């Protein structure tokens, strides 16, 4: 695992966040990516719905580069997904008329997220996107990277 301000973060760093969601009854699937880079397996989510046939509403999400890859995947799978969660990430793909529910969050003190790019690419999200700026939050705040 590299430090919190670089890519290639182990997927298990996001387990505590997903655990909190799971405690609320939300099925969360944490996918291991080759070399801890979502860009190396852009279709990793393809086989997941068939493993959980009882689930009817599917969201995909990710943090940073993983979020950008999730957005790219969502743009190509709008008929199969219900929503997208972007954590310190933005979408370069046009999702404006996708019908997806989108939630985007980042920290007010995020020194890694390219804010100019984030703002410029907000045009790619549906008008009803929900956005949260976490006061005092930083880029690494979405994961548990260890000491």
What are these regions (language model features)?
Residues 61-70:
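Gly/Ala-rich beta-loop-alpha elbow adjacent to hydrolase catalytic centers
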Residues 18-38:
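Conserved alpha/beta-hydrolase
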Residues 1-22:
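Short, surface-exposed "cap/lid" segments of acyl-processing enzymes
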């Amino acid at each position: 695992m590299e430090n919190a301000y670089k890519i290639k973060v182990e997927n298990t760093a996001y387990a505590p966040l997903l655990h909190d969601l799971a405690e609320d009854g939300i099925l969360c699937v944490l996918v291991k990516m080759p070399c801890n880079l979502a860009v190396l397996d852009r279709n990793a989510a393809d086989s997941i719905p068939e493993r959980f046939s009882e689930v009817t509403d599917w969201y995909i999400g990710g943090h940073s580069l993983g979020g950008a890859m999730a957005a790219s995947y969502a743009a190509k799978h709008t008929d199969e997904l219900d929503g997208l969660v972007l954590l310190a990430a933005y979408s370069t793909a046009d999702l404006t008329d996708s019908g997806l529910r989108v939630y985007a969050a980042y920290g007010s003190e995020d020194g890694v997220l390219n804010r100019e790019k984030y703002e410029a690419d907000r045009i790619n999200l549906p008008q009803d996107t929900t956005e949260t700026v976490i006061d005092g939050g930083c880029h690494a705040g979405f994961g548990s990277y260890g000491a």
